[in-house]
Amino acid sequence: MSLLQLLQQETGKIGLLIDPDKTNARCDLTKLIEKCNQSIVDYLLIGGSKVQTGDFHNVIQHVKSISKKPIIIFPGDAKQVSKYGDALLFLQLISGRNPDYLIEQQVKSAQAVIDSGIECIPTSYVLLDGENNSSVAKVSQTTPIKQTELDIILSTALAGQLLGHQLLYLEAGSGAKVPVSLETIQLIKSKTKQALIVGGGIKKIETIQAMQALGVNLIVIGTAFEENPSFFEVLPKEQ
């Protein structure tokens, strides 16, 4: 079974986002993965906005050698492709209008993705306002959609579905003060057919449980682990 099929069939799963930019040494990364192996985290997502190609390959290869969890590449740019991942999210930032992230990065990476043989999953990437100036907004030079603009969020998600994207990733941004709202999730789940990934600003167990109850397929957590390593120990099991 492909990783996409797993994501489509499962709900309430937990993903750990690892940004190699924030991992200062291999020993720190090793400790993180070893702890993750003993936790109920289901997937590892790896990617960052400033990682050099060689470093990225090395990180993916190292994590693959010690991880018991599937590795999903969450690329920050066209250079972040590696055969050592289990799947790659082929992202299109459809919430913005910067052509570099609508088509240019995809064109640059296409041959490398094919040559790697990695499972490639077309993914709508929709940036929502998490009430912070996120690194995604800075790097992509795009403006997040306000979370009160539900009709625009829905129309954007449906456009991605019509473009043939298999996954929808709603992103409030790393360290967001406000995560993707439950109202937004409920609307998207009721009106779209794509498997749903939600990330950004998720720091409370209650938020995770509420998202699980609404049928989010994959809940991505990053900053909460960075700020509180014991977060591994209190993660809730799927409802």
Descriptions of predicted regions:
Residues 80-161:
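Conserved anion-binding
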Residues 73, 77-91, 190-221:
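Catalytic cores of alpha/beta
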Residues 1-23, 109-122, 129:
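N-terminal amphipathic alpha-helix/helix-capping segment at the start of soluble metabolic enzymes
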Residues 139-184, 226, 231-232:
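Glycine/Thr-rich beta-alpha phosphate-binding loop at enzyme active sites
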